[in-house]
A protein has these predicted regions:
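N-terminal charged segments
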Residues: 1-65, 78-79, 83, 145-148, ...
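Short amphipathic alpha-helix that is part of the acyltransferase structural core
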Residues: 2-10, 43-49, 97-100, 107-152, ...
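A conserved beta-turn-beta hairpin within the catalytic core of GNAT-like acetyltransferases
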Residues: 35-41, 182-190, 200
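Acyl-donor-binding surface of acyltransferase catalytic domains
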Residues: 51-123, 247-249
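Conserved acetyl-CoA-binding loop-helix of GNAT-fold acetyltransferases
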Residues: 52-60, 195-197, 201-214, 235
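Conserved hydrophobic beta-strand within the GNAT/NAT acetyltransferase core sheet
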Residues: 72, 190, 220-225
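Conserved active-site alpha-helix within GNAT-family acetyltransferase domains
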Residues: 79-93, 206, 226-243, 248-250
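A conserved beta-strand-loop-helix scaffold within acyl/acetyltransferase catalytic domains
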Residues: 143-194
Length: 264
């Protein structure tokens, strides 16, 4: 496989590190029955397109039985090639984000800094209410369950042998966070990068990313749509790489009483 294929597969299979999963002949279904509304740990990926239709039926039955909304993270041209299949099975399709992938290729040129105390979080007790409020409180207005979902996710992450979660503390306050995931395809994936609203613009994210780059001992990648974050990643040595036909993700969600395709 070439590097682009490895990135795509690493992306699709990364949740194996922090979710329960069931592998099938056509792909994989991720789930977490203690965090049912967190999309990134409750979705299916169909790898073999030739089994797309039977996969839809299995996905719908599997998640419905668990009381979880059936959801599929689509890849390639699946949103287009299987548009009618998805609609006939009751799945609506929507676009998500405007993302670009980046591969770590060059040396880090971020200016050295020593403002933070960077710690690796290794137990559930490290996921404090102070940390959650600092990092995710800003999203509560649009999503009242953000902190609960994030608490459940981070507590799974710190118990995983394939994840490393780091927090940058400024004067003992959680200021920023980032995760490294070791994927089954020999790559490191940067994810869950977040800076507390009150600490933005002070170079803390740059310091944390530079720290993580030094830890990478395998090819590393990430995806982002945030211009400010992208500038940091490029200074850290990441370079854009096109791995998918469009700079966005497509998701399919089962709509129990509305068998329509939301994507036009």
């Amino acid at each position: 496989m070439n590097i682009k294929e490895l990135i795509v597969l690493s992306d699709l299979y990364a949740p194996k590190a922090y979710a329960d999963f069931k592998e099938t002949e056509w792909g994989v279904m991720f789930y977490d029955e203690k965090n049912k509304t967190m999309h990134d740990v409750n979705h299916a990926c169909i790898i073999k397109d030739e089994s797309f239709v039977p996969a839809l039926q299995e996905i719908r039955a599997f998640y419905t039985e668990k009381g979880i909304t059936p959801r599929i993270y689509l890849s390639g041209f699946q949103h287009r090639d299987h548009k009618s299949d998805l609609a006939s099975c009751g799945f609506g399709v929507y676009r998500f984000g405007n993302f670009q992938h980046f591969l770590l290729l060059d040396s880090c040129t971020l200016a050295p800094a020593d403002q933070l105390q960077i710690r690796e979080l290794k137990s559930k007790n490290d996921i404090t209410e102070k940390l959650l409020n600092n990092l995710y409180h800003t999203y509560l207005a649009e999503d009242s369950d953000t902190i609960n979902r994030s608490r459940a996710l981070l507590r799974r992450v710190v118990q995983s042998k394939d994840c490393r979660l780091f927090c940058g503390f400024f004067e003992n306050e959680p200021a920023c966070i980032a995760m490294l995931v070791k994927t089954p395809f020999g790559m490191d994936c940067f994810d869950l990068v977040e800076t507390a609203e009150k600490f933005k613009g002070r170079g803390f994210a740059s310091e944390l990313i530079a720290y993580l780059v030094r830890l990478c001992d395998r090819p590393a990648f990430l995806f982002s749509e945030n211009p400010a974050a992208i500038r940091i990643y490029e200074k850290a040595g990441f370079r854009r790489i096109k791995v998918s036909p469009e700079p966005c993700f497509y998701r399919a969600v089962y709509q129990e009483r509305q068998r329509v395709n939301a994507f036009a």
